Amino acid sequence: HPRPYVDRVNFNGTTLNMNGLKQTLNIKKVPGYENFDWGDGEAPDNEYDGLYNSGSFPSGHTTKTYNRGLGLATLLPELGPELVARAAEGGNNRVVLGVHYPMDVIGGRIPASASVTALWSDATFRQNVLLPAHDELENYIAARCKADGNGDTVAACVSKTGANDKNGYKNTFTDAVSTEPVTDRASAIDAYTARMTYGFSQTSAAGQAPVVPQGAENLLLTAFPHLTDAQRRQVLEASEIDSGYPLDASSNGFERINLAKAFSAKVTLSEDGSTITAISFGAKAPTVVKTASSKDTITGLLTDFNKYYVAGKGVTDEGKSVLAHDDQLT
């Protein structure tokens, strides 16, 4: 498919068959802003005109910006929503420049998500490269934060400086898709979510069961290290947008998972930690809490007392063992 600014009526001396689509969108290519010497022996130029003959789908620059943005978010999950929203902005810039269509950008995000997932799912690469990189980055930032009096950890620093709120990533740009400026975490998540579909209508069945790509749970390993793989997959399931949007059917779930939301999840576990009882999004940090015990203090004391003493029978064997141990200590 040709670039948006291509003259489809007179492209290299021919008229392109657009199968009923508009012959021109009246989009003008932004002029190159510099003549760069690429060191290839040719006269310096921006080589922008070479895009005329290249296809539009998918956007390779979008794949790169999401690849870097999603990758960095896994290394610094405390700012995950902001980093992936910034990646979405990079993809959107390709539309603003008039060199790609929104569908190209969606098509660029999907393989980037898949490639970062593949890296985190490679146990050797994860152990030898990604986790050490995560630790090095966290330790460096924590040391700088401590030196500046902003706490001893990245989480404390992010909270104190407000980098996960109104003092963090901002962008005043708005358009027909992302209608509100990014001013805090909530609006960053909204911008990312809007750019997942670009306002397209659903082209296949809505309301289908969630689909989480194999290994995608590893994207949340640093954000939720104490959850199981299955529980991290549940977080991704809960983050997903609805089914049926363009490219969903062929994406194996990568079109749907919303990593801006997932990195802001508050996960509530059962008292024993085995079951997720609730998931909400928009938290200032990746958070895991446990359901409070249903037993009140008096009930708990009575339960413990009955383990050691039974009315009509006296001290139990377990109680005698405790008393004997107490005698040894005293």
What does each of the following model-derived ranges do?
Residues 99-162:
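Extended amphipathic alpha-helical segments with heptad-repeat/coiled-coil character used for oligomerization
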Residues 148-180, 184:
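Extended ligand-binding clefts on enzyme/binding-domain cores
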Residues 1-96, 132, 136-143, 175, ...:
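Hydrophobic alpha-helical bundle signature of multipass membrane enzymes
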